[in-house]
Every structure is written in structure tokens, then in C-alpha cells.
């Protein structure tokens, strides 16, 4: 008998009681698709190996495999996880957690019509950035603002609007690459402008910019090196110095600030990060930054600056392609409104709350976590509380660390650590941590909810 004839038909699988149950639970179409894929795999296996795929030895095995694949297919992939990596703004885990106010505003915008492009006072159409622009001007001192879907888009829009077919002067030490091999020179190429590099990797002087300026120069650009740091024999030009030079030639200065802090983090005992207000005070015409990093809101690219320049950005065709939807704008507005009460910011802005949690509070959480872990793990594992260092993440202050506390897990038995990591990731709400010095580190600095974590551990 041919091996191919041993493969069950889709109809035969569907007519079994188990097949009928699966069709009722997952839907007829989904079950048929999985059956078809599995049978095709069986044919390929026979063709290549000249034997039957093990799951086709018995129809009950086949149906069990179909159910497993249906469960895997139906599982939500962008699922909630516990961030115990010690990186608060973890790009791979979604960066900033939204505040309660931002979540509420976003949910309201999802379920209701909102005055997105409608002026309630005038009773007519308005611009969707209008309300947020007013807030940003109030917070930064700038004349106007423009909102797009991320900071790379903000840089692209600025370049395409003001520098297409022209030259942009930038220091070699600021030709950054962010995640995914995404580079400033690549953005410039897409915007249709010519990159003019000045200075060297570690030293750039004001005279380097001066010598590069010509009749085809569109503007001078500064990029905040937020995701790396050059130390030692270095020299760079400040925005204030660059603005003074640019004004001699009637040129603008534009700054990609990256993380985009709106408050001085040093007042909270955190590493100093340049603020948007500082750059505006230095005379920079356009400043771009992210919404989902130190700002603590949704992903967005924010541009603040002089009204005449912002108006041109708003009318560029790319702006419509890059604009944000009502949910993001609602979340961003609610986030920015928290900054109007700076004395309460560390309580209500989730990102700042996580960054400023006292070490004593983290130690209390660590004791709770250690206690639960000791009840769930075998004696093959050692569980200890250890001082740790966390980082902000998302390219913010790469050399700076923040004191933290971690629960560490170690074992002398081969393969046990890897097995536990797999168990952590297989939990209903996976635990994402780090491995360092042959130990699992569960760093509590970036954890949003200790009670939720403890409930998850109980399912280990």
C-alpha cells in the first residue's frame, strides 16, 4: 500500500467527534486550513524520507497535533509580559508604559467620536495637531508644534521639507545608527538631500561647519548621541555656538534630540539629559524628539519650533502620510497634561515613577518575590536578593546606571537554568529577564505590578 494513501483526508478528520469539536471551538475554516497544511507536510515528508510522519501513525495523534497547532495559532502574539530586564524603556518590550490618564483618554477615543479635527468654539474644521501644539508651546516655550508617528518620521519630514536637493551639514560624530541598522545617512538619502560630514568621529570644531557652508546649504543639523557616548580626547559644538554661526548665513539649525526630556531628570536624582526647553532657549529653530521614551507617552515623533517652519511642515504631502491617529493623539495629550502639574509628575507618569522608585521599596518587592519563588522551585536552585544596576533604555543615557534590586537564581546542575528560562517564557504572562554571571537576574526596577508578577509565579 502506498504511504500516501495512509494520509487521512480532510473530510475524514472533520467527521470524527474530535474534528467536529475542534470545528465548533476554532471554526471550520481554521481547522480545514491546519488539516491541509499538516497533510501537505506529510506528503513532503514521504517524498523526502520515504516514510510516514509520526503524527500520521494514528488518527488520534493527527487530531492531537491539529489541536496543538490550532491553540498555537489562536494565541495572541503581542501579549503582556513582565519586564524584569533592568531596562525600563525596553524597545523590544514596547518602551514607555502609558499613564492611567493616557490609557483612559485612549480608551475614550476608541469608543467615542472625538473632536479630532473640529474646533468646538468656532464650530468648524481645525487641524488635528492644534490642541497638542498649544500644550507643547505652553510646556516648551516654542511657537508651534507638529506631530507624526515616530521620531525617525519627524527627521524625515524636516529633511524632505527643507533640504530636498540641498545639503545638510552634520558632524561625523553624530551620524548615529539606531535599532535595526537604521541610520541618519539613510534617512537623508530617502529625503533627497545631500549629507555633508564635517569634523572627525571624536572632534568637531565650529570652523569645520563654517568651511562647509555654501549657497546650497539648507541647514545645520545636530543629533543628540543618546544611544552611545564618545569619551576621552573629544570636542563638539553646542547648539548655542551653531546657532550663532548659522545666523551669520541666515540658516536654520535643527536638532534631533531623540529621547526628548521635558523636565530636568537631575532633580529626581537621575542622570542629566538635555531638555527640549534648553535647546529652544539656545535658539534652535526646529527640535524633534520621541513621545514614547523619556516623555513617557505613546509612540510619536514631536517637532517643536518656529511657527513659520512648522507651518511648512504641516503643508508638506508627507505630513498626511506620517500623521497620528486619534488614539495616539488622545494618549499624547493626556500625557502632556500631566506635565502641567510638575509637583505630581513622579506619581502619575508611569515611566518617571519606575525610574524614581526608592531602592527600599524595590527591596521589599524582592523579598516577596523570593518568598514565592522558594515555594515553587526545587532545591536544585538557589534564590537570593542582590543589589543590581538598571538602565533607562531606548538610547537614553547609555553609560548611566540607576541603583536597583534583583532576585537572582542560580544552579549547579547543567541545563537547569535554561530550562527555567523556558518555563518563565511559557507562562501565561511571560517573564522576560536577563542572564548574567551564570545567574538569572529578575531586576525589579522596570516592574509595573508586583502583585501581578506574584500571581504569575504561582503558575510556574
Swiss-Prot record:
GO molecular function: L-seryl-tRNA(Sec) selenium transferase activity
Presence of the UniProt keyword Transferase in the record: yes
Name the UniProt record assigns to this protein: L-seryl-tRNA(Sec) selenium transferase
Lineage start: Bacteria, Pseudomonadati, Pseudomonadota, Gammaproteobacteria, Pasteurellales
Keyword Aminoacyl-tRNA synthetase: no
SUPFAM superfamilies: PLP-dependent transferases (SSF53383)
Gene3D superfamilies assigned to the protein according to its UniProt record, in alphabetical order: 3.90.1150.180, Type I PLP-dependent aspartate aminotransferase-like (Major domain)
GO biological process, one term: conversion of seryl-tRNAsec to selenocys-tRNAsec
A Pfam family matched in the record: SelA
Reactions it catalyzes: L-seryl-tRNA(Sec) + selenophosphate + H(+) = L-selenocysteinyl-tRNA(Sec) + phosphate
Pathway: Aminoacyl-tRNA biosynthesis; selenocysteinyl-tRNA(Sec) biosynthesis; selenocysteinyl-tRNA(Sec) from L-seryl-tRNA(Sec) (bacterial route): step 1/1
Family: Belongs to the SelA family.
EC identifiers of the protein: 2.9.1.1
Keywords: Cytoplasm, Protein biosynthesis, Pyridoxal phosphate, Selenium, Transferase
Modified residues (N6-(pyridoxal phosphate)lysine): 293
Cofactor(s) the protein needs: pyridoxal 5'-phosphate
GO cellular component: cytoplasm
Source organism per UniProt: Pasteurella multocida (strain Pm70)
Function as written in the Swiss-Prot or TrEMBL entry: Converts seryl-tRNA(Sec) to selenocysteinyl-tRNA(Sec) required for selenoprotein biosynthesis.
UniProt-annotated location(s): Cytoplasm
Amino acid at each position: 500500500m502506498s504511504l500516501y494513501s495512509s494520509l487521512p483526508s480532510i473530510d475524514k478528520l472533520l467527521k470524527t467527534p474530535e474534528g467536529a469539536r475542534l470545528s465548533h471551538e476554532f471554526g471550520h475554516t481554521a481547522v480545514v486550513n491546519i488539516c491541509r497544511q499538516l497533510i501537505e507536510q506529510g506528503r513532503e515528508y514521504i517524498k523526502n524520507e520515504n516514510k510516514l510522519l509520526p503524527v500520521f501513525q494514528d488518527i488520534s495523534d493527527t487530531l492531537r497535533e491539529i489541536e496543538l497547532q490550532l491553540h498555537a495559532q489562536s494565541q495572541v502574539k503581542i501579549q503582556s509580559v513582565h519586564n524584569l530586564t533592568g531596562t525600563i524603556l525596553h524597545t523590544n518590550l514596547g518602551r514607555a508604559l502609558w499613564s492611567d490618564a493616557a490609557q483612559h483618554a485612549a480608551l475614550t477615543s476608541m469608543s467615542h467620536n472625538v473632536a479630532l479635527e473640529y474646533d468646538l468654539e468656532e464650530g468648524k474644521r481645525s487641524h488635528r495637531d492644534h490642541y497638542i501644539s498649544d500644550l507643547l508651546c505652553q510646556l516648551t516655550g516654542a511657537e508651534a508644534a507638529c506631530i507624526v508617528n515616530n521620531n525617525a518620521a519627524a527627521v524625515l519630514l524636516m529633511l524632505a521639507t527643507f533640504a530636498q536637493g540641498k545639503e545638510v551639514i552634520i558632524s561625523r560624530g553624530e551620524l548615529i545608527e539606531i535599532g535595526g541598522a537604521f541610520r541618519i545617512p539613510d534617512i537623508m538619502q530617502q529625503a533627497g538631500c545631500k549629507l555633508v560630514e564635517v569634523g572627525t568621529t571624536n572632534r568637531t570644531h565650529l570652523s569645520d561647519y563654517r568651511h562647509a557652508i555654501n549657497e546650497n546649504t539648507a541647514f545645520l543639523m545636530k543629533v543628540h548621541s543618546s544611544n552611545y557616548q564618545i569619551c576621552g580626547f573629544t570636542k563638539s559644538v553646542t547648539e548655542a555656538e551653531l546657532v550663532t554661526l548659522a545666523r551669520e548665513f541666515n540658516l536654520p539649525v535643527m536638532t534631533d534630540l531623540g529621547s526628548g526630556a521635558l523636565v530636568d531628570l537631575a532633580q529626581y536624582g537621575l542622570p542629566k539629559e538635555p531638555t527640549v526647553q534648553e535647546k529652544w532657549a539656545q535658539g534652535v529653530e526646529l527640535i524633534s524628539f520621541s513621545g514614547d521614551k523619556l516623555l513617557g507617552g505613546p509612540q510619536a515623533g514631536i517637532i517643536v519650533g518656529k511657527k513659520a517652519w512648522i507651518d511648512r511642515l504641516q503643508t508638506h504631502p508627507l505630513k498626511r502620510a506620517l500623521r497620528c491617529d486619534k488614539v495616539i493623539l488622545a494618549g499624547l495629550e493626556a500625557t502632556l497634561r500631566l506635565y502641567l502639574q510638575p509637583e505630581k509628575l513622579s506619581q502619575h507618569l508611569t515611566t518617571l515613577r519606575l525610574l524614581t522608585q526608592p531602592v527600599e521599596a524595590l527591596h521589599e518587592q524582592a523579598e516577596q518575590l523570593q518568598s514565592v519563588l522558594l515555594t515553587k522551585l526545587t532545591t536544585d536552585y538557589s534564590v537570593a536578593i542582590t543589589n543590581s544596576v538598571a538602565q533607562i533604555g531606548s538610547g537614553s543615557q547609555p553609560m548611566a546606571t540607576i541603583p536597583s534590586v534583583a532576585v537572582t537564581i542560580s544552579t549547579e546542575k547543567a541545563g537547569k537554568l535554561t530550562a527555567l528560562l523556558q518555563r518563565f517564557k511559557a507562562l501565561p504572562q511571560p517573564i522576560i529577564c536577563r542572564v548574567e554571571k551564570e545567574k538569572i537576574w529578575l531586576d525589579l526596577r522596570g516592574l509595573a505590578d508586583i502583585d501581578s508578577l506574584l500571581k504569575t509565579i504561582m503558575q510556574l
